[in-house]
């Protein structure tokens, strides 16, 4: 083990998790009187289309959830990416 590896530690597990799963959180303040638009199904379909251009995914691999917390709406998008076997 090299000096730098001992000093900073190995982040192999974290890198694997990040590679296999992408999570995105978006929060915005919702004002009163703004009509609610049900965009989640369309968003999920479009995410599948875009991500499928780069990696093979199906609709079960993408979860979209909208949560309300006080005056904020939190949009959570979880994408499970397929594992890639890389010989190193």
From Swiss-Prot:
Recorded superkingdom: Bacteria
Gene that this polypeptide is encoded by: minE
Gene3D superfamilies from the UniProt entry: Cell division topological specificity factor MinE
Keywords annotated in UniProt: Cell cycle, Cell division
Pfam families, sorted: MinE
Organism, scientific name: Aromatoleum aromaticum (strain DSM 19018 / LMG 30748 / EbN1)
Keyword RNA-binding: no
Function: Prevents the cell division inhibition by proteins MinC and MinD at internal division sites while permitting inhibition at polar sites. This ensures cell division at the proper site by restricting the formation of a division septum at the midpoint of the long axis of the cell.
Listed GO biological process terms: cell division; regulation of division septum assembly
N-terminal signal peptide: none
Lineage start: Bacteria, Pseudomonadati, Pseudomonadota, Betaproteobacteria, Rhodocyclales
Name used for this protein in its record: Cell division topological specificity factor
Disulfide bond positions: none
UniProt xrefs under SUPFAM superfamilies: Cell division protein MinE topological specificity domain (SSF55229)
InterPro entries from the UniProt entry: MinE, MinE_sf
Family per record: Belongs to the MinE family.
